[in-house]
UniProtKB/Swiss-Prot annotation:
Transit peptide range per the UniProt entry: 1-39
Transmembrane segments: 571-591
Residue numbers on the Mitochondrial intermembrane membrane side: 592-753
Protein name per Swiss-Prot or TrEMBL: Rsm22-cox11 tandem protein 1, mitochondrial
Organism: Schizosaccharomyces pombe (strain 972 / ATCC 24843) (Fission yeast)
This protein's record includes keyword Electron transport: no
Lineage: Eukaryota, Fungi, Dikarya, Ascomycota, Taphrinomycotina
Keyword terms, alphabetized: Iron, Iron-sulfur, Membrane, Metal-binding, Mitochondrion, Mitochondrion inner membrane, Transit peptide, Transmembrane, Transmembrane helix
PANTHER family, alphabetized: CYTOCHROME C OXIDASE ASSEMBLY PROTEIN COX11, MITOCHONDRIAL-RELATED, CYTOCHROME C OXIDASE ASSEMBLY PROTEIN COX11-RELATED
PTM: Specific enzymatic cleavages in vivo by mitochondrial processing peptidase (MPP) yield mature proteins including rsm22-1 and cox11-1.
Cross-referenced Gene3D superfamilies: Ctag/Cox11
Protein encoded by which gene: cox1101
Entry GO MF terms: copper ion binding; iron-sulfur cluster binding; methyltransferase activity
GO process annotations (BP): mitochondrial cytochrome c oxidase assembly; mitochondrial translation
Amino acid sequence: MPILTCRYKILFLYNLRNCFTFQNQRCLIPYGTTTTIRWYNANFQAVQNNFSDYKNELISSHRPEASSLLDFLVKDQKKSGDISLHTKFNLYVDDLLKKSEKGQIKKFINDIKKDLATESQLPLSAPFKDESTRTMTDPQVLAYIHQSMPYQYASLYSVLTDLKIVNSDVSCKSQHILDCGKGPGIGALASYSVFPTPNSVSIVEENPFLKKIIYDIHHNIYPSTSPNPTSPVTLNRLPLGKKDSYTLVIASNKLLEMKSEKELFDYLRSLWSLVSNDGGLLVLCERGTKRGFSLIQRARTFLLQKSKNTSDKQFNAHIVAPCPHDGRCPIDIENGVRANICSFKQHFFLSPFSRLYVPRSHRRSSDRSHYSYVVIQKGITRPLNNTTQRFKNDEDLLENVNVTSPTLKNWPRIIRPPLKRDGHVIIDVCDSDARLRRNIVPKSQGKLAYRLARKSAWGDLFPLEGKVQSTSPSSKITKHLKDASSTYSINPPSYNKPKVERNTTADPIFVGKRFYSTNRHKAFSRFADFNSHRFPCIFTSFSCYNCISGTRKYSRQYSRDKFHYNQRTTIYYLVAISIFALGLTYAAVPLYRLFCSKTGYGGTLNTDQSRMNAERMVPRKDNKRIRVTFNGDVAGNLSWKLWPQQREIYVLPGETALGFYTAENTSDHDIVGVATYNIVPGQAAVYFSKVACFCFEEQKLDAHEKVDLPVFFFIDPEFADDPNMKDIDDILLSYTFFEARYDTNGNLLTKLN
């Protein structure tokens, strides 16, 4: 009992020491705890001396607080999200932007945004190339710095921090850094923040304006922010005469400038020749798009092939990060599947100059940099010890308290955001056997294991095996790259993959959109195998279908993307329907008039010229006569009179007839009128064919003038054969005159008053 009491006191005091801020051993805490603080100050030194003994006792008793492996996985490998450029850098760039012409800078910024949008939309087969800084004007350089410098710095800072974690020896060596990246020596700036002061720094840049910016930043600004400044050397081109001289070569956002594969491979050969044979490192970093990852994938394959094709051991190479293996990349980007790339994100705070030339509604204080990268070490092969070492439960995590650099290189890496569900965590990793694995870590696996899974993040090392695992289909040939001595094969196609048999253990988890469910698939497979002898046709076909497709279970991010896609699609359809309805509204009147004139619908006289022939103008004497009644009227205030000279005419179907109307101008001035007509009943209009009449023609009558207007017509013989017309004995032909009006161009305006 006294031992436990002392132990709890020590633990309480240690936690109290971590929770409060001290200034000359005075705690900034409320007044009510002064008694406790006096006792704490008196016993502080004794607690500090006894705490190391207590920690060793915890290690021996397997308590989780002392596990250095857990400390590494949960704390040490975590990257800070509080990344930002130094204030003096921000002030310098802000001053450059304010002195330049605002219109040109804004134009080039919009061009860069359009290029980024075009890159994400174009397929990989389409040609695309970034503009090199060699041909940029001064405003273009400033626009590129405004758009890319914070993102590029955050990406490189994250990559170099990860490199320092995985390969701890790199910080102990004498550093000779060569920065070949795009921009004002951003790789060198990031290396200053991660590694100790290097022995030498060289920056490759040809643009005169960028060289001036590099000089101002690295010679005037950086020395005032660092206790041990290093003056870099600016080079116009790669120093090919200094082969095997640099321990760290950084090339960021450069591969997209290459016009062809030959130029890309020549550039990679030149970079590789500059890397030191004694464990030198080559860092390649591009934007986290499909095209950027494709270039990183090509460079990775090419350099590994180059090292395998040489027998000299000093040219051996292996991947330091992010891949835990040197085999073929298991991610097949050619399928065009969403999220089918290996990329990572880094949170950072935007610089003040990044908010210039940005609408107020789009301004924000932080953002995320999306990038793909690879770090290759030259002259050293991958360590083979502990390649199969994995941890499954809390006891394994507590037994392994030592973390070494060779072990970290073979640990799986999380390649997608973990899916943290209620009671379990789903984690997708790239493993050391060149396969993609999905680990499901439930609460029942252990408190420490579940805590580790909940604390894991995208890009972390994750050596813990889940209680449930699914493996992507793979083959032995993916562990070794195919020899390509004559031609350089970049990510060769999958024709070497073996056929998947029915009883294979590979799960179709990584086929299709993104993820698939495994539990229901496995449960039904067992049920189908048990009952397949009873219903062979049903269960065999369903099992084959399930093995190929599986039951889809998308992540929350995919569900959100799908919702936004459906929302946008619905909006597009509504807009298209609205435009179509508006156009149909304007076209309805002339279309209806055309329809009526062709068919006679709605009482409109039939004007189809194909019916006006002599063969149809033959009377049907065996049919009854139809009485045609005439009517005349004028519209509005038109000072005319219109009346038919005959009230009615009896005609046979097919018999022609001639009728007359009389129009009189009763006013004291000349008037131009236009007549329209109608047929009643409307269904008979299709058979009422008009050969000649005065409708829709401008009729000018002088003051008090009177004229006769003829109407020559016949009823189509098909009228007698239509059963719907057998009860129709009377047809009314009505004409209406209205005054003609004209616009400023002399065109007739048909307006009824």
